[in-house]
Amino acid sequence: NNMKKKNKIVKIIAILVLIILVIGTGLYIKRRNNYIYITQFSPTTSRQMMGYAIKTLNGKIVVIDGGLQEDAKQLEKYITDNGGEVDTWFITHPHIDHAGAFEIISQNTSIKINKIYMSIEDKDWYLTNEPSRTIDIEEFFKVINQEKIAEKIIEPQVNDIIKIDNITAKILGTKNPEITTNAINNSSMVIQIQVN
């Protein structure tokens, strides 16, 4: 009789452990599916650059800056390997080490870009406040003034919330025309990314 009780208790414990394992595994898989994948690209030259890509829960691609023109190939490969489409592209500011890859990819590839968020001053402001960047600024504005690009540009405001699948981007800072020292860097868009 005691042996039957012990066997019954062992069976109940085994069933409970199995249930806990199944539920735990299911919760782990559910949490795991909420992950995003963030890629920080390395420079392909000896020069500095900044480029990130985020792959959301449903496989949407979000790019932040992208790097130099010379870095475009690695970013293009990443985007192509992940479906060939950028849902949202954030350009923080028009320095070539941030926006150069965007200039190349938006002009010379079949990659589809749906939305482009940037907070940009007019061209004369950049030319006045950082004349040493004239060539870069001229090239950048030549690209963004093309109809196929201009129609996709959205200028966010501070505290705007942009939802892309399971991520939320909050705009913390935008252009600052009153700051003319290190003007382009100090007029960068600042974005906070949160995973939901």
Cite the ranges covered by each PLM segment:
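Active-site metal-binding motif and surrounding structural segment of the metallo-beta-lactamase
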Residues: 57-62, 69-122
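Short, flexible/disordered intra-domain loops and linkers
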Residues: 124-135
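Short Gly/charged-rich anion-binding patches and loops
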Residues: 74, 100, 139-142, 157
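Core dinuclear metal-dependent hydrolase active-site scaffold
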Residues: 24-84, 149-196
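Intrinsically disordered, low-complexity coil segments
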Residues: 41-50, 107-112, 127-129, 146-148
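Conserved glycine-bearing catalytic or ligand-binding loops at nucleotide- and phosphate-handling centers
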Residues: 133-151, 155
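Alpha-helical transmembrane signal-anchor helices
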Residues: 14, 18-28
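N-terminal Sec-pathway targeting helices
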Residues: 3-18
